[in-house]
Design a protein with these regions (language model features):
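Short consensus segments that form the blades of beta-propeller domains
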Residues: 69-71, 104, 180-185
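Flexible, processing/modification-adjacent segments and terminal tails
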Residues: 34-37, 111-183
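Short, exposed beta-strand/loop patches in secreted or surface proteins that constitute
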Residues: 47, 78-83, 105-107, 149-158, ...
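Gly/Pro-enriched, hydrophobic low-complexity segments
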Residues: 96-98, 160-270
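A structural detector for beta-sheet-dominated domains
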Residues: 57-63, 91-93, 109, 126, ...
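Short, hydrophobic/aromatic-rich segments at coil-to-beta transitions
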Residues: 51-57, 85-91, 160-168, 203-206
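An acidic-aromatic
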Residues: 75-139, 212-214
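N-terminal leader/targeting segments and the immediate start of mature chains
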Residues: 2-84, 243-296, 300
Length: 300
């Protein structure tokens, strides 16, 4: 009888061993595949960061969970950029969709940057730290490498018939990198990278970021908000197919040249106004990280 019981257990033991081996094999395969996907994505991101010129259009949305995107707030960005031996030159503005109301406007080139004091319609110039890798905000996701420590999952997919990668961030990284209110709690976050090719070079043509955040109001009530950030890149031309260098030159000549002051002069004016009791309002400063992202400072 004991022999029969032992024999009856053997198939079950064998089955358990087979299942364990299969699970381990799948986990190893999944880990290797994820590593390969991450390498492919980072190669495309590196190629994007090396693009010589182009433009970008970005749209940001913030709305309550379960509501329509149009029910919340939104912002539209437009950027053009050109890389040279000494660094990147770019112009980027943000505001409403038709550009009639701007919340920020920047023109940055190696060694200096200009920002628009929107209250006074006055451009302000200041020195830019040499070697600082500043990029348009609209390009930050497409040109920032992804680490395995940031992600919970990566998989390959297609969007509108184009190859793409979806990266799902892990909660620990979301919590440590979130730059919102201290009472906010990021729940989930992901980015879809849509790829394009230029000859043999694969680069990121579009990014779609989504972040779900639990927010707490002054009364202690909690709700979930959804933040979406969609950025489309145009390689080599402006949005309307024009020459990037010419567009940058024209923008500077028409908007900034002869219409800016030094930031040191602005600080002097501010000090004087403060001492005299006047109320002074200064627009967004180019020293804020919202200018763009760098290897040292991420805007997101």
């Amino acid at each position: 009888m004991a022999q029969k019981k032992t024999n009856s257990k053997k198939p079950l033991i064998i089955l358990c061993v087979v299942v364990i081996v299969a699970v381990l094999a799948f986990l190893i395969y999944d880990e290797v595949q994820s590593s390969n996907y991450l390498n492919q994505l980072n190669e495309a991101i590196s190629n994007t960061a090396a693009l010589e010129s182009g433009s970008a259009v970005g749209h940001s949305y913030l709305y309550a969970e379960g509501a329509d995107r149009e029910s919340g707030s939104s912002e539209t960005r437009h950027a053009i950029y050109l890389r040279g031996d000494d660094g990147i030159t770019f112009q980027e503005s943000a505001g409403n969709e038709d550009g009639s109301e701007l919340t920020s406007n920047f023109y940055i080139r190696p060694g200096e940057y200009f920002y628009l004091d929107t209250e006074n319609d006055q451009w302000v110039r200041t020195d830019l730290q040499e070697g600082l890798n500043v990029r348009p905000y609209s390009l930050s996701a497409a040109t920032s490498s992804v680490s395995s420590s940031q992600i919970r999952r990566i998989h390959k997919t297609t969007v509108d018939g184009k190859d793409a990668f979806e990266v799902i961030y892990n909660r620990q990284w979301l919590m440590s990198s979130y730059q919102g209110q201290s009472t906010d709690e990021p729940l989930t976050g992901s980015v879809i990278y849509i790829l394009a090719t230029d000859g043999d070079t694969t680069y990121v043509e579009e990014t779609r970021q989504t972040l779900n955040v639990r927010v707490t109001d002054s009364d202690g009530n909690t709700s979930t908000q959804i933040s979406e950030d969609i950025n489309q890149l145009i390689n080599g031309t402006t949005e309307d197919g024009g020459d990037v260098q010419q567009a940058l030159d024209d923008f500077f000549a028409q908007n900034i040249e002869g219409n800016y002051i030094e930031s040191t002069d602005l600080e002097t004016e501010t000090d004087t106004a403060t001492k005299s009791g006047e109320e002074t309002t200064i627009g967004s400063s180019g020293e804020e990280t919202t200018v763009g992202s760098s290897d040292e400072n991420s805007a997101e």
